[in-house]
C-alpha cells in the first residue's frame, strides 16, 4: 500500500512539474505569436496607409485638374454673345465691337486675335 502511495505521489509530482513547464512554454509561445501578430498587423497597417496615401494623391490630382478645367469652362467662347461690360472671353480671344450679325442683335462677341 505504501509503494502505491509513493508511486502515485511520484507520478503526481512529475505531472505537476511537467505541466508547469508546458504552461511556461505555452506562455512563451503565446508571447512570440502575439509579437509576430503585432508585426504582421503593423506591416498590414503600413501597406494600407501607403495605398490610402496613393489614392488620396490621385484624387487630389484629379481635383486640381478639374479645377483647372472648370475655370476654362466659365469663360465665354468664340462666337458666343455677351454683355458689353462682361470681360470673360477665353484665352486667345478678344472682345470686339459688334460687326455683321452682332449689329442686328446689338451683342458683343469674342473673336480670335
From Swiss-Prot:
Entry keywords, A to Z: Disulfide bond, Ion channel impairing toxin, Knottin, Secreted, Signal, Toxin
Signal peptide: 1-21
Pfam families: Toxin_22
Single GO MF annotation: sodium channel inhibitor activity
GO CC list: extracellular region
Main location, first listed in the record: secreted
Disulfide bonds: 75-90, 89-110
Keyword Calcium recorded: no
UniProt region (Disordered), positions on chain: 60-87
Record's compositionally biased regions (Basic and acidic residues): 60-69
Role, per record: Probable ion channel inhibitor.
Family, similarity comment: Belongs to the neurotoxin 14 (magi-1) family. 01 (HNTX-16) subfamily.
Domain notes: The presence of a 'disulfide through disulfide knot' structurally defines this protein as a knottin.
Protein name: U11-theraphotoxin-Hhn1e
Amino acid at each position: 500500500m505504501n509503494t502505491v502511495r509513493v508511486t502515485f505521489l511520484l507520478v503526481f509530482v512529475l505531472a505537476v512539474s511537467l505541466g508547469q513547464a508546458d504552461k511556461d512554454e505555452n506562455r512563451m509561445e503565446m508571447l512570440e505569436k502575439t509579437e509576430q501578430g503585432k508585426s504582421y498587423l503593423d506591416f498590414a497597417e503600413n501597406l494600407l496607409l501607403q495605398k490610402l496615401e496613393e489614392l488620396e494623391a490621385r484624387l487630389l490630382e484629379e481635383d486640381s485638374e478639374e479645377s483647372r478645367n472648370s475655370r476654362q469652362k466659365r469663360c465665354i467662347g468664340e462666337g458666343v454673345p455677351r454683355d458689353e461690360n462682361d470681360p470673360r472671353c477665353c484665352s486667345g480671344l478678344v472682345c470686339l465691337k459688334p460687326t455683321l450679325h452682332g449689329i442686328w442683335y446689338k451683342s458683343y462677341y469674342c473673336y480670335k486675335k
